[in-house]
């Protein structure tokens, strides 16, 4: 083509307008750069304002020792009979997630041990009827080390000392334990042993892909340690939409049956993205109660604004 003269290399020479560059007017990027600079380097020549905080109103510290609770009931009955005891209760049981998933979701797991220690004993006395306190596992373990420069084991021992009457619960990522890779079976087993020894009573075990193979070792070791294996199925999709037939009601019922057969003491529904609609919660809990003879524990998130209604329908 060059030999025939159809193409040449004179385009730039013949188009001088290419060098008439317009001044950049990307104000959005400039603003972002300024914000980033101030965030990282602080104000140049300006005194940063000191934020003012409202005084903290501490919950009342009731006199006397905490009343006996679910911790004593588990120690008395053991995991198997304790599971049956849960099913016999005429009222709904509640887990408080303030010390784990709440601050993990709201501000990157940055709640410090010292702040929780100030109220732990008051919670034990003021809320002795709670089923459990989710206070460990998930991202709390690595964040304590990497960002807060704290010892998560000391935090757990503090909880056990100050809350002797309520079950302490953690989130365990199956073969990933509290890390972000797969660990050898003996590592997972030893971690569970030490977690139980230092205070954990309920292990909520899950795998992001609902793979039972990734949860079997954890379930087995939790049972070996005489603790409660609350095994979770992760919810996604929309079981109310017939067009979404991969993760439908039959899929979750089948997963629930597999988890029950694997040794779960409690079956959890882990709605980590807050996708479970109210009517879907009713349908799913109803189907699982018909399929397995286990307590059902629902965990969801409020991102959609539907969580309280989903809980209400699940209770129905």
Where are these regions (language model features)?
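Non-catalytic terminal accessory/regulatory regions of metabolic enzymes
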Residues: 1-178, 183-185, 193-196
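Alpha/beta enzyme core
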Residues: 32-35, 89-94, 111-135, 145-167, ...
């Amino acid at each position: 083509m060059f030999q025939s003269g159809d193409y040449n290399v004179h385009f730039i020479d013949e188009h001088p307008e290419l060098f008439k560059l317009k001044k950049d007017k990307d104000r959005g990027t400039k603003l972002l750069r300024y914000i980033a600079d101030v965030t990282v380097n602080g104000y140049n020549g300006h005194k940063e304002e000191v934020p003012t905080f409202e005084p903290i109103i501490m919950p009342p510290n009731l006199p006397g020792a905490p009343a006996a609770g679910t911790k004593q009931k588990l120690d008395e009955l053991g995991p198997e009979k304790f599971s049956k005891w849960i099913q016999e209760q005429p009222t709904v049981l509640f887990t408080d997630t303030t010390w784990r998933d709440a601050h993990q979701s709201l501000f990157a797991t940055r709640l410090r041990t010292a702040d929780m220690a100030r109220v732990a004993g008051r919670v034990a006395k003021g809320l002795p009827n709670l089923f459990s306190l989710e206070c460990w596992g998930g991202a709390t373990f690595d964040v304590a080390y990497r960002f807060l420069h704290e010892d998560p084991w000391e935090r757990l021992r503090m909880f056990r000392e100050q809350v002797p009457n309520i079950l302490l619960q953690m989130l365990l990522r199956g073969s990933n334990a509290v890390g972000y890779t797969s660990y050898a079976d003996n590592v997972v087993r030893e971690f569970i042993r030490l977690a139980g020894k230092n205070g954990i009573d309920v292990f909520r075990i899950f795998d992001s892909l609902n793979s039972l193979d990734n949860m079997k070792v954890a379930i087995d070791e939790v049972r070996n340690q005489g603790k409660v294996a609350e095994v979770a199925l992760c919810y996604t999709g929309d079981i109310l939409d017939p067009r979404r037939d991969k993760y439908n009601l039959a899929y979750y019922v089948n997963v629930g049956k597999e988890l029950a057969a694997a040794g779960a003491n409690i079956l959890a529904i882990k709605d980590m993205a807050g996708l479970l609609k109210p009517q879907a919660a009713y349908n799913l809990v109803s189907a699982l109660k018909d399929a397995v003879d286990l307590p059902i524990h629902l965990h969801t998130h409020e991102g959609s604004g539907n969580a309280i209604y989903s809980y209400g329908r699940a209770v129905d």
